[in-house]
């Protein structure tokens, strides 16, 4: 049986694209070994792998000197453990989806001379993917502008692998304006307290608009308003996307690409502490095309959001939806898998 090693975890931004590609490979008859960390989302979520191996890894970025040393040591020691596993199982290739948890599999694959492929989710690549790109056979990118950070001969624009239920619902979805204006607010996995508080305040003023707020982990005081529905987290995002006229969201890669797939006009508020400010650049290109609004956290207020919403509802959202959807890539997982399998056909 054909075998592949996959790594991508720590957070959902790395985990879910890896899961999407793994499901595709399973359908094609591959045996999958997943490499992750005991400290990440992968320790709580199922993954379509025949074997799931989790190691106690530590991050390096943003830590103290002692923390960095501990992080480097944990990644190097894990690299040698993964190397032994690779020599034992002899995979045909490995795929890494970024984040510090990918470094051991990437380095071990290089040392064991196993073909390595990586996928970069964000506009500005992570340090781990920058390092691993030197050893990779191909670098799959989500945004066209990311190619300049890698060897262009290696880069392939594939888009962002998304969950099946999102893709299946979005493919044939056509936006039609709601009778009652509806705004979906997505705080992202880390939440957005300031954004949530601004929306709650705004909902009490703009009573002709229905607000659906996914607030994340933050504790905020929620008044009893008929036009405001609040969730901490939801699994059925596809239902909420289809019910909205406008989306207000953080701009992590998964959220951005889901919004593109549903063709939603969005007001993006990038998470200001994202590495290299990548959330800002994930949507700057879309703003330059006039297909979204972009508000930096430092400029965020109830008044600014109110003005942005009023401007949004004065636009031809139906026409904009068609233009936005043109930038969606619905078969990202298949593009990645096809590119890899074609390499083996041509070798």
Swiss-Prot record:
Protein keywords: Cell cycle, Cell division, Cell inner membrane, Cell membrane, Cell shape, Cell wall biogenesis/degradation, Glycosyltransferase, Membrane, Peptidoglycan synthesis, Transferase
MF terms (GO), sorted A to Z: UDP-N-acetyl-D-glucosamine:N-acetylmuramoyl-L-alanyl-D-glutamyl-meso-2,6-diaminopimelyl-D-alanyl-D-alanine-diphosphoundecaprenol 4-beta-N-acetylglucosaminlytransferase activity; undecaprenyldiphospho-muramoylpentapeptide beta-N-acetylglucosaminyltransferase activity
GO biological process: carbohydrate metabolic process; cell division; cell wall organization; lipid glycosylation; peptidoglycan biosynthetic process; regulation of cell shape
Keyword Repressor found: no
Function: Cell wall formation. Catalyzes the transfer of a GlcNAc subunit on undecaprenyl-pyrophosphoryl-MurNAc-pentapeptide (lipid intermediate I) to form undecaprenyl-pyrophosphoryl-MurNAc-(pentapeptide)GlcNAc (lipid intermediate II).
Transmembrane segments: none
The protein's name: UDP-N-acetylglucosamine--N-acetylmuramyl-(pentapeptide) pyrophosphoryl-undecaprenol N-acetylglucosamine transferase
Catalytic EC class: transferase
Organism, scientific name: Sulfurihydrogenibium sp. (strain YO3AOP1)
Binding-site residues for UDP-N-acetyl-alpha-D-glucosamine, renumbered to this chain: 11-13, 122, 163, 189, 279
């Amino acid at each position: 049986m054909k075998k592949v090693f996959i790594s991508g975890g720590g957070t959902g931004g790395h985990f879910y694209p890896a899961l999407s590609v793994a499901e595709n490979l399973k359908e094609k008859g591959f045996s999958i070994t997943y490499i992750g960390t005991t400290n990440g989302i992968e320790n709580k979520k199922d993954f379509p792998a025949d074997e799931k191996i989790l190691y106690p890894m530590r991050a390096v970025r943003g830590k103290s000197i002692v923390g960095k040393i501990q992080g480097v040591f944990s990644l190097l020691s894990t690299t040698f453990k993964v190397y032994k596993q690779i020599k034992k199982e002899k995979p045909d290739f490995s795929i890494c989806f970024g984040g510090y948890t990918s470094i051991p599999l990437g380095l071990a694959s290089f040392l064991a001379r196993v073909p390595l492929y990586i996928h970069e989710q964000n506009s500005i690549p992570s340090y781990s993917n920058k390092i691993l790109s030197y050893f990779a056979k191909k670098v799959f990118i989500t945004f066209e502008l990311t190619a300049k950070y890698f060897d262009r001969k290696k880069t392939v624009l594939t888009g962002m692998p998304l969950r099946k239920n999102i893709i299946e619902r979005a493919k044939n979805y056509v936006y039609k304006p709601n009778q009652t204006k509806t705004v979906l607010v997505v705080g992202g996995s880390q939440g957005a307290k300031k954004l949530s508080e601004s929306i709650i305040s705004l909902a009490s003023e703009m009573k002709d608009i229905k607000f659906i707020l996914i607030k994340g982990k933050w504790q905020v005081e929620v008044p009893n308003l008929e036009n405001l529905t609040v969730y901490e987290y939801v699994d059925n995002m596809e239902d909420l996307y289809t019910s909205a006229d406008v989306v207000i969201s953080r701009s992590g890669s998964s959220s951005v690409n889901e919004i593109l797939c549903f063709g939603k006009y969005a007001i993006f508020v990038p998470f200001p502490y994202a590495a290299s400010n990548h959330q800002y650049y994930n949507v700057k290109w879309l703003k330059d095309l006039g297909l979204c609004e972009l508000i930096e956290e430092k400029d965020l207020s109830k008044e600014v959001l109110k003005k942005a919403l009023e401007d949004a509802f004065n636009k031809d959202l139906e026409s904009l939806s068609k233009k936005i959807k043109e930038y969606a890539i619905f078969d990202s997982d298949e593009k990645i898998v096809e590119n890899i399998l074609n390499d083996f056909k041509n070798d």
